Structure formats: structure tokens, C-alpha cells
Amino acid sequence: MRCAATPAEAEALRHDIAGRFQPRAEGNRFIVYDDVANRRIWMFTTQAHPAHPSVACLEIVARNGAIGAEIQIGCFSSAANCAALNREFEARGAQVRQALAPH
């Protein structure tokens, strides 16, 4: 899994993902796509988000018998906007990890 390294790559990735999966909007700041077959969640900012254009790729992984989630973020805004976006996406990743944890 690799998130975009440039704004142009982020847009190309968004176009590719949008052509293969149904979007699941989350408010007006994100568009989310679930790639169930590859256990991935793609999250793209919309123009309403201060850190636009940005993308996060969350992948469900198994390691040493445990299920977890890895997240990569490609942010192409100011340092402050990207730091805020990282906190948002990391919080989402933590929610996924918690949901996957054995109860």
C-alpha cells in the first residue's frame, strides 16, 4: 500500500479509487471508500477541508497473530493543517484498531 507522494498523485489515486468503489461521504470534509477485498479504507479530503488535497490509506493487517491497522497519510497543505489532519486520521485509525481488538 502506498499513499500519494504529490498532489497530482493524490488526485490520480482518488480518480482510480472512485472508479472502482462506491463513496461513503463523511460530512462535507471527507469522502471515504472501502476496499473490502484488500482490507483497505481510503479517505480523501474535499475542498471544504483546510488540508485539501490530502489522502489517508488505512490497511487492516495481521502480525504475530494480532489484527491491527496501519495508516499512511499524504498531506499537501501547510504544516499546521497537515498536523491537524494527522491527528484526525490517527484518531480514526485508533477507532479502527479498537474495533478490531479482541474483547
Positions of PLM-derived features:
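Short, surface-exposed coil-to-beta transition loops
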Residues: 51-57, 68-70
